[in-house]
Regions:
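Alpha-helical interaction segments
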Residues: 22-25, 87, 270
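Bacterial extracytoplasmic/cell-wall-associated proteins, especially those involved in peptidoglycan
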Residues: 59, 135, 141-147, 156-287
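N-terminal type II signal-anchor transmembrane helix
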Residues: 2-47
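Signal peptide-directed extracytoplasmic domains
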Residues: 31-199
Length: 287
């Protein structure tokens, strides 16, 4: 090989390498620009958002492919790259999420990493019987049904409170929870909320009340509320009932008769109803 040939060959190689480097630089610049555009754009969902379930055991790459197939993002590989860059690849939590139209891909990943799932609500209604509450829980399409028995005593045992009567044990309130919450979890939460409120009220009670437990106080309060819908009348009625208890008298209050009649109550209380013994009838039972 002559000297001129060697110089020519090296010059040609240099030009090729420069072209390769230039192409690589341009490619890298284009990729960087696309990545920055991907980071800044919002995801494609409707104005109402999209309820999306990220299943247990799913991966970041699986999430990216699924979102791309749904048209939520257009660059699944870039979402995977972003997840690894943010160190969130193994921190995504299973659950149902609402993806909003103002979210960037980074917002979406943070939502799943934080476990900020969509929440639903159910209200335990004041005066609701345990059977009515149980039916409402079972009618929910977001609460998972696990209780297989209809027996109230068995249900209380499953909840962890064997031997306790279920009536009045669940605090009337609105509860928020994610999809997949079980019926047991929901009832345990409402039970715990009532226990906390009862404990607070019991601590603040008058010491001379003729009541032996927080549950007895709850029963009396429930009877008073059923006697009248007017808050200004309740102290007077509670005082009357308290005096009867101190004297060892029966309360003889109609709401306890109605409660004992259950679904057979047609809006009227007859003499035979007052005389029919039930666990709740204060015309036939003391205390």
């Amino acid at each position: 090989m002559t000297e001129d040939t060697g110089i020519g060959w090296r010059g040609w190689l240099t030009r090729v390498l420069l072209l390769v480097l230039l192409a690589s630089s341009i490619g890298a610049a284009l990729l960087y620009t696309r990545y920055q555009r991907f980071l800044e754009q919002t995801i494609s969902v409707s104005a109402d958002g999209l309820l999306y379930e990220f299943r247990s055991g799913a991966s970041l790459s699986g999430l990216a492919r699924d979102l791309a197939e749904r048209g939520v993002i257009d660059q699944p590989r870039m979402l995977g790259l972003l997840g690894r860059q943010m160190d969130l690849a193994h921190r995504l939590q299973a659950g149902e999420y609402r993806l909003r139209d103002d979210m960037t891909p980074a917002d979406l990943l943070r939502l799943l990493a934080d476990g900020d799932t969509e929440h639903y609500s159910m209200t335990v209604i004041e005066g609701q019987t345990f059977r009515e509450l149980l039916n409402a829980v079972r009618a929910s399409d977001v609460i998972e049904a696990t209780l297989e028995t209809e027996d109230a005593g068995e249900i209380m045992s499953v909840l962890g409170y064997p031997g306790e009567h279920p009536e009045g044990r669940f605090l009337p309130d609105t509860y928020h929870f994610p999809r997949g919450t079980t019926d047991v979890e929901f009832l345990q939460r409402a039970y715990a909320a009532m226990q906390q409120q009862l404990a607070t009220a019991w601590e603040d009670r008058q010491e001379d009340l003729p009541l032996d437990s927080p549950y007895e106080a709850l029963i009396l309060a429930s009877i008073v509320e059923k006697e009248t819908g007017r808050a200004d009348e309740r102290p007077r009625i509670a005082g009357v009932f308290t005096q009867r208890l101190r004297k060892g008298m029966r309360l003889q209050t109609d709401p306890t008769v109605i409660y004992g009649m259950g679904e057979s109550f047609d809006g009227n209380i007859r003499r035979r109803d007052l005389q029919t013994d039930t666990p709740y009838n204060t015309y036939t039972r003391d205390g």
